[in-house]
């Protein structure tokens, strides 16, 4: 039981993370870009590396906020090859706020009041990360959308 936060990586943090990603990716076929010229490949790799670092930073941020706001055990920040995170062109994370296989958590998750707590904690995590995200955009000399 507890909260886990994942960010994309080709290699999973551990065996359990790898198994979770395999199970969650079942039936999904990722779209891979056609062969790129060397310059585009290098630019894509540079962009991916920056996004990967920022996703790790975002995952740590989410993990800390959620475990504190929801008063839950933190199970850590983990890496795994989740297809749902593959095409993100910005920092992206996958958060598990509980486990339906755990009776206590399952009944908590079913309660409307706890669902609201989860939504508020996620909202707090997102909004409190925005200044850092904007700072990262400036560092990369990119503009915030609609500014």
List each language-model region with its residue ranges:
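Active-site-proximal helix/loop segments of hydrolytic enzymes
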Residues: 1-147
């Amino acid at each position: 039981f507890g909260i886990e936060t994942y960010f994309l990586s080709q290699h999973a943090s551990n065996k359990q993370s790898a198994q979770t990603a395999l199970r969650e990716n079942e039936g999904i076929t990722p779209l891979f870009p056609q062969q790129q010229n060397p310059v585009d490949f290098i630019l894509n790799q540079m962009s991916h590396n920056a996004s990967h670092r920022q996703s790790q930073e975002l995952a740590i941020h989410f993990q800390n906020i959620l475990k504190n706001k929801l008063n839950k055990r933190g199970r850590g920040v983990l890496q795994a090859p989740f297809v749902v995170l593959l095409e993100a062109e910005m920092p992206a994370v996958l958060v598990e706020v509980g486990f339906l296989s755990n009776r206590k958590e399952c009944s908590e998750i079913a309660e409307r009041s706890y669902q609201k707590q989860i939504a508020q904690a996620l909202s707090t995590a997102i909004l409190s990360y925005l200044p850092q995200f904007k700072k990262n955009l400036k560092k990369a000399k990119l503009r915030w959308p609609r500014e």
